[in-house]
Curated annotation (Swiss-Prot):
It catalyses: vanillin + NAD(+) + H2O = vanillate + NADH + 2 H(+). Signal peptide: none annotated. The lineage of its organism: Bacteria, Pseudomonadati, Pseudomonadota, Gammaproteobacteria, Pseudomonadales. This is Vanillin dehydrogenase. It comes from the Bacteria. GO terms for molecular function: vanillin dehydrogenase activity. Belongs to the aldehyde dehydrogenase family.
Length: 481
């Protein structure tokens, strides 16, 4: 069992009132983590520690910040086995957590490279003798709120670029992966970033609204970033706006996967299966809508054969490549969506079956607009086939969603696919590649109900720095009074 204290000012500590909560395995129900349940006073203390550490961290030479972040990346990889062991918190497969560590280490290295890429401008002034500059400076304390579904990647992403830009951070961990997020904080601290540069707060689930509001309202917190559901993201966005705190929000998705009539169907099937079912479909970029034209019958037949080879189950079983859902409630929620579609005429092509938190991958065909699965994010191992006639109809179906995070188009005619990609309402679109694709140096963000702002190295600089106008007056200046 993992014991998870808070990390405040470089020191592990219990909650001020000694309260704890438990995280249980979604597979066995056994206690996996016993976790400090932060009070409002603990939230204040974490921000105060970050604020106290800010001047020294911001004043470091960029090469020194780079060196410390690179050490953190190496240490993260060295402790990969500890992160993999923490997969028991979420029931995920070990290969998913291994991939998490690999990509998260890359994010730290990319952030390290950005410490010398924070640039300003010299701007011509209309005032004689005035030398005018636009400069970017660290903001102060940044609050990062990370989810459970890709806990290492998204926990590191919440803090890496804010740190590279010279800010200090408070990471509010997920109640469903608290040890994983606390371990990220420990790795960064052990890499020598400094006491208070990274602080980690965990809270009991029932305390989350009060703790988050307290953190956002704190005057020392200057920026907020949140990755999670659209429902909670709206609340975070409203709180941030109320307190005039700029926020980056990366929220839900219902990624469309367009298969044109000239597509390489074998390649499309492999990408669709990976995008729809990896990590049980619990990824914001997961392929949820397979939008297919004249080749639909052949594509569905090939994909059904692929899905039949995939198995969800105990992640310790080598045959269970998909792992578990986050809990049994998630399975019940998804099954309600599936049952609604089947009752309204959808066809279950292959798969299905729910046993607690284990849901077998499923493919549904003949899904139509009146079914909830047409619009609602399933966040599970369910993909639906939508049939259209021609490119314009496929594009209409792709854009007929409140979400707009990731998308994919498969076609042998790249020019044709690019013309469509430019009209898909999404922050990300991949041609002949899966919807699930992330790289540290790429701008990552959505549109519509998938949020606003972008993560990624250069894209993050604008958000996690303050743009200022500075002038130097050389020589006399005329004033009208």
């Amino acid at each position: 069992m993992f014991h998870v204290p808070l990390l405040i000012g470089g020191k592990p500590c219990s909650a001020s009132d000694e309260r704890t909560f438990e995280r249980r395995s979604p597979l066995t129900g056994e206690v996996v983590s016993r976790v400090a349940a932060a009070s409002l006073e603990d939230a204040d203390a974490a921000v105060a520690a970050a604020q106290a550490a800010f001047p020294e961290w911001a004043a470091l030479a960029p090469s020194e910040r780079r060196a410390r972040l690179l050490r953190a990346a190496d240490l993260l990889e060295d402790r990969s086995s500890e992160f993999t062991a923490a997969a028991s918190e979420t029931g995920a497969a070990g290969n998913w957590y291994g991939f998490n560590v690999y990509l998260a280490a890359g994010m730290l290295r990319e952030a390290a490279a950005m410490t010398t890429q924070i640039q300003g401008d010299v701007i011509p002034s209309n005032v004689p003798g005035s030398f005018a500059m636009a400069v970017r400076q660290p903001c102060g304390v940044v609050l990062g709120i990370a989810p459970w579904n890709a806990p290492v990647i998204l926990g590191v992403r919440a803090v890496a670029m804010p740190l590279a830009c010279g800010n200090t951070v408070v990471l509010k961990s997920s109640e469903l992966s608290p040890f994983t997020h606390r371990l990220i904080g420990q790795v960064l601290h052990d890499a020598g970033l400094g006491d208070g540069v990274v602080n980690v707060i965990s809270n009991a689930p029932q305390d989350a609204p009060a703790v988050v509001e307290r953190l956002i309202a704190n005057p020392a917190v200057r920026r907020v970033n949140f990755t999670g559901s659209t429902h909670v993201g709206r609340i975070i966005g409203e709180l941030s706006a109320r307190h005039l705190k700029p926020a980056v929000l990366e929220l839900g998705g219902k990624a469309p996967f367009l298969v044109l009539d000239d597509a390489d169907l074998d390649a499309a099937v492999e990408a669709a299966a990976f995008g729809a079912y990896f990590n049980q479909g619990q990824i914001c970029m997961s392929t949820e809508r397979l939008i297919v034209t004249a080749v639909a019958d052949a594509f569905v037949e090939k994909l059904a054969r692929k899905v039949a080879t995939l198995r969800a189950g105990d992640p310790n079983d080598p045959q269970s490549v998909l792992g578990s859902l986050i809990d049994a409630n998630a399975g019940q929620r998804i099954q309600v969506l599936v049952d609604d579609a089947l009752a309204k005429g959808a066809r279950q092509v292959v798969g299905g079956g729910l046993d607690g938190s284990i849901m077998q991958p499923m493919l549904l065909d003949q899904v139509t607009e009146e079914m909830r699965l047409y619009r609602e994010e399933s966040f599970g191992p369910v993909a639906v086939v939508l049939r259209g006639d021609g490119d314009e109809e496929l594009l209409r179906l792709a854009n007929d969603s409140e979400f707009g995070l990731s998308a994919a188009i498969f076609s042998r005619d790249v020019s044709r696919a690019m013309e469509l990609a430019q009209r898909v309402d999404s922050g990300i679109c991949h041609i002949n590649g899966p919807t699930v694709h992330d790289e540290a140096q790429m701008p990552f963000g959505g549109v519509k109900s998938s949020g606003y702002g972008s993560f990624g190295s250069r894209a993050s600089i604008e958000h996690f720095t303050q743009l200022r106008w500075l002038t130097i007056q050389n020589g006399p200046r005329h004033y009208p009074i």
